[in-house]
Amino acid sequence: MANDYLFTSESVSEGHPDKVADQISDAILDAILAQDKYSRVAAETLCNTGLVVLAGEITTTANVDYIQVARNTIKRIGYDNTDYGIDYRGCAVLVAYDKQSPDIAQGVDRAHDNNLDQGAGDQGLMFGYACEETPELMPLPIHLSHRLVERQANLRRDGRLPWLRPDAKSQVTVRYVDGKPHSIDTVVLSTQHSPDIDLGTLREAVIEEVIKPTLPADLIKGDIKFLVNPTGRFVIGGPQGDCGLTGRKIIVDTYGGAAPHGGGAFSGKDPSKVDRSAAYAGRYVAKNIVAAGLASRCLIQVSYAIGVAQPTSVMVNTFGTGRVSDAVITRLVQEHFDLRPKGIIQMLDLLRPIYEKSAAYGHFGREEPEFTWESTDKALALAEAAGTEPVAALAE
């Protein structure tokens, strides 16, 4: 890769139609896990103008009012007016859940005991990543993209910019020099708005109130290109503007394209699904490796076969930044982390109703108390085993 290059990531707000679907799916998952933590859940959501469809496979003893959970989620996001294209009070909600296939269940239904040989819920490959670009050990472009749409939502909620509406998208382009962030090149922010705000006022307010307070001062060098609502009017948005589906924002959910993705979405899936739990474990492993000072950049790949507990492969790539070899780090991963599905569930305490919060603004790089996969509690042990110095601010 060239020494001087641009890299871009995007994010979307909680009111984006695909994120509405993700949040409904995870709200339903949480409601089920709150009553029956051993449930099998694959909750998919479709949302369109005035309509929500709930489908998938659920096996549980929980008694959940799925329709009310969906309405409550839509209300929390801010779709409380028919002018917005969907209103939590009047939208139709259709429910079409089946039970998990017994052919799948036979390989994963050993979860009620302490048997660590619970098989993976499906085959697949998952990635985890961490780097030193931010204190959260996340790539800078996706981190800033998340913070922009998060701030848009906060300003909408507290009434400082009352003409904002729930749907929004952000995109940040960062200039890298010698592999490190040098400056911010371009910021794109498109936000849904009420029809009575003129474009000039909107653009000035978004730049001054949303964008500039979010950008790190040390990365503002020269003129930044600000593109706010570049097509102009953005009144029709949310599920009215586009049909939303669970699992369509998997790059937004992870590393913004800075690392590979195995293809499996997260939202609506209980932790027996390694699409979710193993990706969380991959982040946990990679973050602890970087926090331990073993490398300044780390990518983990794990893979599984359905019904089999042990990963079929574990790969570590530190892109030449390792203080010890990738082979040594791989051995340390196998010694310090149990990457069997049940081992991951126990290690990260995943059988809890913690997932709705993860369904907007990124599953990674957020220091929420529920997000155990963001802990660096193994950094000191890894550093001691490898003979490196941990990152002081991150090793717990």
Curated annotation (Swiss-Prot):
Family: Belongs to the AdoMet synthase family.
UniProt remark on cofactor binding: Binds 2 divalent ions per subunit. Binds 1 potassium ion per subunit.
Subunit and interaction comment: Homotetramer; dimer of dimers.
SUPFAM superfamilies the UniProt entry points to: S-adenosylmethionine synthetase (SSF55973)
UniProt: L-methionine binding residues: 57, 100, 242, 273
EC number per UniProt: 2.5.1.6
Binding site for K(+): 44
Entry keyword set: ATP-binding, Cytoplasm, Magnesium, Metal-binding, Nucleotide-binding, One-carbon metabolism, Potassium, Transferase
CDD domains: S-AdoMet_synt
GO cellular component, one term: cytoplasm
Protein name (database record): S-adenosylmethionine synthase
Binding site for Mg(2+): 18
Source species, domain of life: Bacteria
Pfam annotation, one family: S-AdoMet_synt_M
An example Gene Ontology biological process: S-adenosylmethionine biosynthetic process
InterPro entries (alphabetical): ADOMET_SYNTHASE_CS, S-AdoMet_synt_C, S-AdoMet_synt_central, S-AdoMet_synt_N, S-AdoMet_synthetase, S-AdoMet_synthetase_sfam
CC cofactor: Mg(2+); K(+)
Native source organism of the sequence: Paraburkholderia xenovorans (strain LB400)
GO MF assignments: ATP binding; magnesium ion binding; methionine adenosyltransferase activity
Reaction catalysed by this enzyme: L-methionine + ATP + H2O = S-adenosyl-L-methionine + phosphate + diphosphate
Pathway this chain belongs to: Amino-acid biosynthesis; S-adenosyl-L-methionine biosynthesis; S-adenosyl-L-methionine from L-methionine: step 1/1
Region (Flexible loop): 100-110
The organism's taxonomic lineage, starting at the top: Bacteria, Pseudomonadati, Pseudomonadota, Betaproteobacteria, Burkholderiales
